Amino acid sequence: MFLLLNCIVAVSQNMGIGKNGDLPRPPLRNEFRYFQRMTTTSSVEGKQNLVIMGRKTWFSIPEKNRPLKDRINLVLSRELKEPPQGAHFLARSLDDALKLTERPELANKVDMIWIVGGSSVYKEAMNHLGHLKLFVTRIMQDFESDTFFSEIDLEKYKLLPEYPGVLSDVQEGKHIKYKFEVCEKDD
């Protein structure tokens, strides 16, 4: 079975994605709505999208917002023995998570797969063979960060000039400019 694999991430100019287990910048309402819309919207009636995240990302989400609603939540951890409270599934690696999607309890329920963090999960996905789309919000300034996104290899990934449902013009919120980009690889 072939499921679409996507990463969605917001990066500042220094490729920072986190600081002290939180965003390195103020939350941007329209960027958050974009994240929700992209990761929630299924193209197949009766199916849901699967969001895959690392343990630290899971626990960085405020408890009242866990699990991410209208999505199947899977946490990656080599330490946990069972899914954390609220999570639907647990896997030790991205490969194990992808194998889980072939099992009967998920095979007929999952439409798209969205990797939502953190940095090691993104890196594992970006090095995974096969088709992958990166939905990157480029925050057009630096923020002090302690967690970073890998540089995108433009030899491997092609920046798409446009993508349905993704605004291509510069956005602004809380005096922070940002733009949405979509990159794709197929190896």
Swiss-Prot record:
Tissues expressed in: Expressed in numerous cell lines.
Q: Which InterPro entries match?
A: DHFR, DHFR-like_dom_sf, DHFR_dom
Keyword Membrane listed: yes
Quote the record's binding site residues for NADP(+).
10, 16-22, 55-57, 77-79, 117-124
- The record lists substrate as bound by 31-36, 71
GO annotation, cellular component aspect: cytosol; mitochondrial inner membrane; mitochondrial matrix; mitochondrion
According to UniProt, the reaction catalysed is: (6S)-5,6,7,8-tetrahydrofolate + NADP(+) = 7,8-dihydrofolate + NADPH + H(+)
Q: What is its EC number?
A: 1.5.1.3
Chief location bin: mitochondrion
Q: Where in the cell is it found?
A: Mitochondrion; Mitochondrion matrix; Mitochondrion inner membrane
Q: Which UniProt keywords apply?
A: Membrane, Mitochondrion, Mitochondrion inner membrane, NADP, One-carbon metabolism, Oxidoreductase
Q: Where is the DHFR domain?
A: 4-185
In its UniProt record, which GO terms are filed under biological process?
dihydrofolate metabolic process; folic acid metabolic process; one-carbon metabolic process; tetrahydrofolate biosynthetic process; tetrahydrofolate metabolic process; thymidine biosynthetic process
Q: What class of enzyme is it?
A: oxidoreductase
Question: Which pathway does this polypeptide act in?
Answer: Cofactor biosynthesis; tetrahydrofolate biosynthesis; 5,6,7,8-tetrahydrofolate from 7,8-dihydrofolate: step 1/1
Molecular function as annotated in GO: dihydrofolate reductase activity; folate reductase activity; mRNA binding; NADP binding
**What's this chain's function?**
Key enzyme in folate metabolism. Contributes to the de novo mitochondrial thymidylate biosynthesis pathway. Required to prevent uracil accumulation in mtDNA. Binds its own mRNA and that of DHFR.
UniProt miscellaneous comment = Humans have acquired two dihydrofolate reductase enzymes during their evolution, DHFR and DHFR2. In contrast to human, mice and brown rats have just one.
User: Belongs to which family?
Assistant: Belongs to the dihydrofolate reductase family.
In its UniProt entry, what is this protein called?
Dihydrofolate reductase 2, mitochondrial
Which species expresses this protein natively? Homo sapiens (Human)
The encoding gene is DHFR2
